[in-house]
């Protein structure tokens, strides 16, 4: 078995796929033989993908606008012809504050992007998917252990896991595997903003907050985008052909809420 080319002749849709985790996954899939369609809210990132990749097509799409999703899925099938893999990667960090300082608007925005966009993408695309495919929804370890001051975010990630487990049962007869990927403390600009916001709430320094957050993981280090792309490849290829309905953490073993 050629472990580096297991997605040859496969097609994939990756939402929020022009930067960060989604882009790392899209690149890994392309390197492994897949033809990939991505959407993203960052037009500069979309332009970069289209300039630098032969087998990844990117378009602008604001997944907080539900009415744009049907059009995005139609564009996916126009480009790919058929669809084997869906990666629901869209997500925002949401507000970082105590429950009394959270806003209803912030809650609703987090729900829309992190949960409703996943549902709507699958509602429209899954009936047209090829049997024997795979769906991977990016959740978070916050959907397993809970994160203080991140109530909307954590709630949506629990929801993503619940959707994946339920859909795995429903789509089993079609041999479509459905799993959730749970990143831990992911290195990057978004994580830095979260650490900064939590440090402000706690009244401590950025470095103190970062050290405290990393101490929650047994391995004591950040997760990289590439770590997550490798796991996504495993779960969406034949390497994970008997794995479905699972919530797979890539977090360095976060043992406690933080």
Feature-to-residue mapping (PLM):
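Active-site helix of classical SDR
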Residues: 122, 156, 164
């Amino acid at each position: 078995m050629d472990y580096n080319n297991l997605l040859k002749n496969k097609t994939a849709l990756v939402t929020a796929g022009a930067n960060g985790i989604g882009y790392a996954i899209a690149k890994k899939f392309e390197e492994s033989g897949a033809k990939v369609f991505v959407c993203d809210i960052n037009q500069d990132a979309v332009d970069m993908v289209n300039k630098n990749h032969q087998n990844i097509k990117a378009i602008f799409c604001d997944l907080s606008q539900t009415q744009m999703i049907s059009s995005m899925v139609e564009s996916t099938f126009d480009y790919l012809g058929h669809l084997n893999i869906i990666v629901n990667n869209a997500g925002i960090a949401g507000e970082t504050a105590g429950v009394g300082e959270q806003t209803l608007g912030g809650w609703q925005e987090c729900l829309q992007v992190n949960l409703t966009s996943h549902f709507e993408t699958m509602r429209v695309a899954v009936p047209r998917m090829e049997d024997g495919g795979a769906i991977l929804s990016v959740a978070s370890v916050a959907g397993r252990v809970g994160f203080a001051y991140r109530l909307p975010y954590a709630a949506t990630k629990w929801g993503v896991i619940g959707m994946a487990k339920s859909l795995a049962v429903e789509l089993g007869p079609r041999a479509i595997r459905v799993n959730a990927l749970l990143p831990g403390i992911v290195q990057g600009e978004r994580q830095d903003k979260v650490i900064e916001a939590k440090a402000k709430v706690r009244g401590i320094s950025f470095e103190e907050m970062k050290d405290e957050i990393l101490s929650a993981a047994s391995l004591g280090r950040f997760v990289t985008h590439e770590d997550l792309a490798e796991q996504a490849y495993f779960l969406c290829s034949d390497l994970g052909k008997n794995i479905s309905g699972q919530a797979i953490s890539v977090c360095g073993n976060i043992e406690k809420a933080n």
